[in-house]
Amino acid sequence: MPLPQPLLGGASPAPARAASSFLHPLLHTRHRVSTAPAAASSFVPASHSSHANDAMLLRRAADVADRSAGLTSPHPNFGCVIARPQLNTDSADSWVVGEGFLYAQGTPCAELLASQEAGEHARGGTAYLNLEPGDCFGDNTAVGSLVQAGITRVVVGLRHPLKHLRGKAIQALRNEGIQVDVVGEDLQSKLFKEALKSCLTVNAPLLYRAAFHVPFSVLKYAMTADGKIAASSGHASWISGKASRGRVFELRGRSDAVIVGGNTVRFDDPRLTARHVKGHVPVRIVMSQSLNLPEEANLWNLNDAYTIVATQRGARRDFQRKLAMKGVEVVEFDMLNPRAVMSYCYDRGYLAVLWECGGTLAASAISASVIHKVYAFWAPKIIGGLNAPTPVGELGMSQMTQAINLIDVSYEQIDRDMLMSGFIEPIPDLSPVIPSVEEIPSIDPEVSPYETNIISFYKTWDIFGAFSNFSPHSIQMPDENGDYFTWPTVEHYYQAHKFVGVDNPQARDIVQEIKLAKSPEEAARIGRTRQKGFPELVRTDWESTKIDVMYRAIKCKFSTYPHLTNMLLSTAGSVLVEASPHDLFWGGGREGEGLNYLGRLLMQLRSEILGTVPASAEVGEAD
């Protein structure tokens, strides 16, 4: 059965406009100058009411973008609101004909969902985007969706903060004759101040990651009215009330990982889960130099969540082996400190990290400039105690004038408690650092700028993110019955085939569950947990066939989307590495110790397309 040739990366065919220059703008843009004067980046005066409506709808787009919080792991938050003014009402809210948001990495983009909801009502309308499109490098569905929907104007809150994506979608839209107004450039009214703040806040993790090359880090603690986080004995359950603890669960759900120190494990034995049945569960990280930790602890139970122990190189190798037997990942550092751990979290692709540690580790993290925001829960209790611990240990400050003043402070009463939050480091606004079109790099599929370089890929929004199994590119491949089925991503296909062909109703149920997974993240979680919990349901030949299963899937993906093939060919001469620091089979590993089979399969496919190796060659023979 021939495979379809989609017009757009991941999008279903839709009524086409006359020109098709939008098909692959991210691949072929070569410093083109827009031929549409109306779409040029020049300020056009508008009425006060028009600006007010634009600002309100842009804030709504930012609110919509935040709807996946806690449901999936942190990712760039995209929201799209499509509106058309109605003659019978002045309420901008009633003008909305469609809206959508990015649910998770590798899922349909906000612009496509909003366009589908609006249908024909989108034609001639305005699309409000809190962030310039760019949820997957190499995929141009967002731009194509707006063009095909007949959108005539786009209002953008922020340019994309990542350099390899910044300005490209905006230029592609303008090249299609669509008017694009960017807050702070084309729209400079004071009315947009709050709208811009909303756009910055909803993507604070992405902005901090782009600016500082570490995840957005939040320090959270609960303390008594006299500033204690525990009694002198170390007992700390509970300082804050149930409602405040519920808010903490929300903070965890918004984080890739939760970090604690060894004392927290020894004294509190926490679980550090988000306490919900479905949704995102953060990784738990324990920092311990000595590894003087209990052999039995809630954090070693991986049924709740995954756990990483970060320690000094060489510490208690016998205990490391015991943790590894339980499935706990142990990561050694030459110098264990907050900055090193945050660099490691950055390499894992984390956007947001929550610190729930004691005062000593909190002080070290603040001193290392890796804490960006503080959430302090005050409880109306007094515990006293000369030796009772406080939220932050020694910072080396002797005068009050040296104190760190929090920025953009807010207060909220939560039942009997008070929540104070504020930033140590303000949210970076990268909008002043905007390259001209001539400075925006392009990818020419005909000429490779790489020779023998190593090209890394991992998260979909990173450069070459379309090489990831999580990229939003569906494939048509046979299912367990031999019938062609549209798998949402390569990851869905791969995880399901762990159980395909097993003569057991439970295995068949797992395949169906993975098929229906809303995101590749969810598909991976189902496949991995079922494989671990029910090894008898995994096909007996899985270890010998999984490489072939993966190769069939990625080969289908690249043959279905020609622009991805062009991108792959543009890397000729370079080594491709999946930059996973923890997956030592498919990825390259933290220090290059990984087998990098995904990168090797992509290089084999590249060589096969170029005709340098036969299709039957083993993966180990790939370039």
From Swiss-Prot:
Residues annotated as transit peptide in the record: 1-45
Reaction equation(s) it catalyzes: 5-amino-6-(5-phospho-D-ribitylamino)uracil + NADP(+) = 5-amino-6-(5-phospho-D-ribosylamino)uracil + NADPH + H(+); 2,5-diamino-6-hydroxy-4-(5-phosphoribosylamino)-pyrimidine + H2O = 2,5,6-triamino-4-hydroxypyrimidine + D-ribose 5-phosphate; 5-amino-6-(5-phospho-D-ribosylamino)uracil + H2O = 5,6-diaminouracil + D-ribose 5-phosphate
Primary localisation category: plastid
Entries under InterPro entries matching the protein: CMP_dCMP_dom, Cytidine_deaminase-like, DHFR-like_dom_sf, Eubact_RibD, NADAR, RibD_C, RibDG_C, Riboflavin_Biosynth_HTPR
Keyword GTP-binding tagged: no
GO molecular function per UniProt: 5-amino-6-(5-phosphoribosylamino)uracil reductase activity; diaminohydroxyphosphoribosylaminopyrimidine deaminase activity; dihydropyrimidine dehydrogenase (NADP+) activity; hydrolase activity, hydrolyzing N-glycosyl compounds; NADP binding
Any GO BP: chloroplast organization
Keyword Lyase attached: no
GO cellular component: chloroplast
UniProt EC number: 1.1.1.193, 3.2.2.-
Localization annotation: Plastid, Chloroplast
Pathway membership, UniProt: Cofactor biosynthesis; riboflavin biosynthesis; 5-amino-6-(D-ribitylamino)uracil from GTP: step 3/4
Residue stretches making up the CMP/dCMP-type deaminase domain: 52-181
PROSITE patterns hit by this protein: CYT_DCMP_DEAMINASES_2
Summary of the knockout phenotype: Lethal when homozygous. Required for both endosperm and embryo formation in the seed.
Keywords: Chloroplast, Glycosidase, Hydrolase, Multifunctional enzyme, NADP, Oxidoreductase, Plastid, Transit peptide
Stored CDD domains: NADAR (cd15457)
Family statement: In the C-terminal section; belongs to the YbiA family.
Function description: Pyrimidine reductase involved in the riboflavin biosynthesis pathway. Also has a non-functional N-terminal deaminase domain that lacks the catalytically essential zinc-binding residues. 39% activity when NADH replaces NADPH. No evidence for a phosphatase activity conferred by the N-terminal domain.
Extra information: Unlike bacteria that have a bifunctional, two-domain RibD enzyme, plants have a monofunctional reductase and a monofunctional deaminase, each having an enzymatically inactive domain.
Name of the protein described by the UniProt record: Riboflavin biosynthesis protein PYRR, chloroplastic
